[in-house]
Amino acid sequence: MKAQKTVAALSLLTFGLIAVACGDDDEAASTTAAAETTAAAETTAAAANVCPEKLTIQTDWFPELEHGGTYQLIGPNGTADKATVSYSGPVQSQYAVGGLKELTINTIKFDKANASVLLDGEADMAYITLGDVIKDSKAVPMVVIAKTLDKDPQMVMWDPTQHDIQKPEDILATGASVLHFPGTGYIDYMIGKGYMTADQSNPSYDGSDAKWVAEGGSFFQQGFATNEVYKYENDIAWKDGKPADVSFYTVADMGFDNYPAVITMMQDKATELDACLTLLVPKMQQAWVDFLNDPKPITDAMIKINETHDGFWALSEGLNEAGIALIEEKQMAGNSADGTYCSIDPERAATLYGQLKEIFDAQGVEITDDVTSVYTNKYCAGAPGR
């Protein structure tokens, strides 16, 4: 009996130890789970606040379809301000990440280059061509974080009844001036390629049609193929009291495959907002995809925004429809080489850099030795494609 009692006692003791051990395991598991839950919650909370509540994007012109993906972030129900010539509002919920709540979109500043706008801290991001980022790379430390359109709609147009142009070199033979904004890289390229002379360059363009109308389209003029072509052929009475056909070359047609209006930041600002950009850039690019899939709500809103701004710039449904059609026809809104609608193609950037370096060396303009230093594709990793 004693033997049996001893065994029973040992059994009870063993059971008690096992029970205690099991209790310790359960408590440890509970503690671990609680810690993991807390850590996850803290991580989520941190991710929810990695972005500023408000951001400002500086565009390179008045509201137009070529900016559609940026306006898509706010949607058609934002607020247009005539005094500041801006558009602002809450970021649509499907694009709001990292604690970002509001966005302001500023239009062109005629008295200030966008690189200076960034340098002076007047915007967080700005539209600047990749060529211009390269040109300013020694003077202003900027970095491109994403594209807008894939191909540049920038063009040079002319009256085909006054100038018989069969190839870009024919522009030079006419001796006619080329009206353009100052400081444009593609004009430097055209001069360097022998498509025009420096004497033909007239950098006094202000974006209006007044000079073209006054002189009956006797010269060459810059513009967007997705915009001005329609206006001069349908809206602007510039020849014999009515609109007339124009011909054009895009800068890509002439071999200058620039990236237009890339989303650019000061390098230190991008570093500061690194965690934010990891979340935000894919959403910004999703907004571009969404806009291109259904542009009308935004392009219709842009008509009204320009009316509120009450300047010389105006849009119409016909213009917007024609512009979107041309974007698709000329594949100006295609995916990047990696399948995203976001990244900069390294080979294309290197080719552009080579074209510009020769020009800038001749002009005495110092630029970076490494084109990859002016752009990053790191934030495009989670970006969608079309």
Language-model features and meaning:
Residues M1-A9:
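Bacterial N-terminal signal peptides that target proteins for export
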Residues L17-A21:
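C-terminal motif of bacterial Sec signal peptides marking the signal peptidase cleavage site
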Residues G23-D25:
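Bacterial signal peptide processing site
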Residues A29-A47:
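Extracellular mucin-like PTS domains
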Residues A47-Y205, F219-Q222:
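Short, glycine-/small- and polar/acidic-enriched structural segments
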Residues G131-D132, D206-K211, E215-D310:
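Pocket-lining segment of extracytoplasmic ligand-binding domains
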Residues E272-A362:
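Secondary-structure end/capping motifs
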Residues P346-R386:
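Conserved C-terminal helix/tail region of periplasmic/extracytoplasmic solute-binding proteins
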